Amino acid sequence: MDKQVNVVNYRELKKIPYILLLLQNGVNDHDFTRISVSDLSKQMGTTPQNISKVLRRLEREGYIVRSSVKGEVSVMLSEKGSALLRNLMDLMENLLGKNITIVLRGIVVTGFGEGSYYISLEGYRRQFISKLGFDPYPGTLNVKLLDQYMKYRLYLERVPGVRIEGFSNGSRTYGGVKAFKCTISDIPCGVLLIERTSHGPEVIEIVAPVKLRDRLGLKDGDDVTINILL
């Protein structure tokens, strides 16, 4: 069955260059990022007044959330803004006839042993099943990215992914997670970008329906290639 693609109308298309500009300056959909209106205006070849006007319009129409404290402006992409970019990506995929894929490479490393606890929490597990399409093995595969692939890791911070919402069990609050569907050796998996983590940005965690170390015979130091489907 063909994938249904939501129509991106002309009014929305006019906003995309400005939203992409924000993404290029570090804005994402899970926390506020401080921006420079002056720098944005130089990058777009327009005036700071026009950029401020555009930001107010994007905020008024619900594409971004904006905060201004002591003259410093911070911006976060809203769910509506993320949805617009997803629709654009779906449209591109439909027109090009293929998926957009980002390839990451790294080596397997030992984690802190926390993955099994967090993945087993029902508040996360239910969302992995409904949003990633599989019941996860209670644990994660930790991969340390090679230096030349870190730029793609940073790119993922800036684009919409699958939002795994945080939750509270009454005694503790658990943070949200951005996920991306991916494959490792044709096994469906999910790359997790975790808001609260003890790892540095060079280490990513992979969730899958099976224990990847056992299924693929992986040990610390082994190379891994991750194909992320946008």
UniProtKB/Swiss-Prot annotation:
<feature type="region of interest" description="Riboflavin kinase">
    <location>
        <begin position="102"/>
        <end position="230"/>
    </location>
</feature>
<dbReference type="InterPro" id="IPR036390">
    <property type="entry name" value="WH_DNA-bd_sf"/>
</dbReference>
<feature type="binding site">
    <location>
        <begin position="210"/>
        <end position="213"/>
    </location>
    <ligand>
        <name>CDP</name>
    </ligand>
</feature>
<dbReference type="Pfam" id="PF01982">
    <property type="entry name" value="CTP-dep_RFKase"/>
</dbReference>
<dbReference type="GO" id="GO:0009398">
    <property type="term" value="P:FMN biosynthetic process"/>
</dbReference>
<dbReference type="InterPro" id="IPR023465">
    <property type="entry name" value="Riboflavin_kinase_dom_sf"/>
</dbReference>
<protein>
    <recommendedName>
        <fullName>Riboflavin kinase</fullName>
        <ecNumber>2.7.1.161</ecNumber>
    </recommendedName>
</protein>
<dbReference type="InterPro" id="IPR036388">
    <property type="entry name" value="WH-like_DNA-bd_sf"/>
</dbReference>
<dbReference type="InterPro" id="IPR023470">
    <property type="entry name" value="Riboflavin_kinase_archaeal"/>
</dbReference>
<comment type="pathway">
    <text>Cofactor biosynthesis; FMN biosynthesis; FMN from riboflavin (CTP route): step 1/1.</text>
</comment>
<feature type="binding site">
    <location>
        <position position="205"/>
    </location>
    <ligand>
        <name>FMN</name>
    </ligand>
</feature>
<feature type="binding site">
    <location>
        <position position="197"/>
    </location>
    <ligand>
        <name>FMN</name>
    </ligand>
</feature>
<dbReference type="GO" id="GO:0000287">
    <property type="term" value="F:magnesium ion binding"/>
</dbReference>
<dbReference type="InterPro" id="IPR000485">
    <property type="entry name" value="AsnC-type_HTH_dom"/>
</dbReference>
<feature type="binding site">
    <location>
        <begin position="111"/>
        <end position="116"/>
    </location>
    <ligand>
        <name>CDP</name>
    </ligand>
</feature>
<dbReference type="InterPro" id="IPR023602">
    <property type="entry name" value="Riboflavin_kinase_CTP-dep"/>
</dbReference>
<keyword id="KW-0418">Kinase</keyword>
<dbReference type="InterPro" id="IPR011991">
    <property type="entry name" value="ArsR-like_HTH"/>
</dbReference>
<keyword id="KW-0479">Metal-binding</keyword>
<feature type="binding site">
    <location>
        <position position="140"/>
    </location>
    <ligand>
        <name>Mg(2+)</name>
    </ligand>
</feature>
<dbReference type="InterPro" id="IPR000835">
    <property type="entry name" value="HTH_MarR-typ"/>
</dbReference>
<dbReference type="GO" id="GO:0003700">
    <property type="term" value="F:DNA-binding transcription factor activity"/>
</dbReference>
<keyword id="KW-0547">Nucleotide-binding</keyword>
<feature type="binding site">
    <location>
        <position position="142"/>
    </location>
    <ligand>
        <name>Mg(2+)</name>
    </ligand>
</feature>
<dbReference type="GO" id="GO:0009231">
    <property type="term" value="P:riboflavin biosynthetic process"/>
</dbReference>
<keyword id="KW-0460">Magnesium</keyword>
<dbReference type="GO" id="GO:0008531">
    <property type="term" value="F:riboflavin kinase activity"/>
</dbReference>
<keyword id="KW-0808">Transferase</keyword>
<feature type="region of interest" description="H-T-H motif-like">
    <location>
        <begin position="1"/>
        <end position="101"/>
    </location>
</feature>
<dbReference type="Pfam" id="PF01047">
    <property type="entry name" value="MarR"/>
</dbReference>
<comment type="function">
    <text>Catalyzes the CTP-dependent phosphorylation of riboflavin (vitamin B2) to form flavin mononucleotide (FMN).</text>
</comment>
<keyword id="KW-0285">Flavoprotein</keyword>
<dbReference type="InterPro" id="IPR039063">
    <property type="entry name" value="RibK_CTP-dep"/>
</dbReference>
<dbReference type="GO" id="GO:0043565">
    <property type="term" value="F:sequence-specific DNA binding"/>
</dbReference>
<comment type="similarity">
    <text>Belongs to the archaeal riboflavin kinase family.</text>
</comment>
<dbReference type="GO" id="GO:0000166">
    <property type="term" value="F:nucleotide binding"/>
</dbReference>
<keyword id="KW-0288">FMN</keyword>
